[in-house]
Design a protein with these regions (language model features):
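Short glycine-rich, Thr/Ser-proximal phosphate-binding strand/loop in the N-terminal lobe
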Residues: 3-42
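Short beta-strand-loop/turn "lid" adjacent to the catalytic site in phosphate-handling enzymes
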Residues: 31, 45-81
Length: 82
């Protein structure tokens, strides 16, 4: 089973969580600009992860609707904020 990721694009910070089997990793980066494909790649690479390593990616936070529906054939699931 491939790992999965969730990214929260906040106003000040971008939080990333990757679940790989029984292990969960988390890291936070300062938010820089609007979310786009390049930004997703940068925040994942900060944790040593590529979109190709993942089964899918969930995204939430501001302007997630601007993101493509997939990156490297990995579906981006847009999650509404609560």
């Amino acid at each position: 089973m491939h790992p999965v990721a969730a990214i929260d694009f906040g106003a000040s910070n971008t939080d990333v969580v990757v679940r790989d089997g029984g292990a969960t990793r988390h890291w936070t980066l300062p938010t820089e600009g609007q979310p786009d494909e390049a930004r997703i790649r940068r925040v994942l690479e900060a944790g040593g992860v590529s979109p190709r390593d993942l089964a899918w990616i969930a995204v939430t936070g501001g302007n997630r609707a601007l993101l493509p529906s997939a990156i490297d054939d990995r579906v981006l699931h847009r999650v509404d904020e609560v």
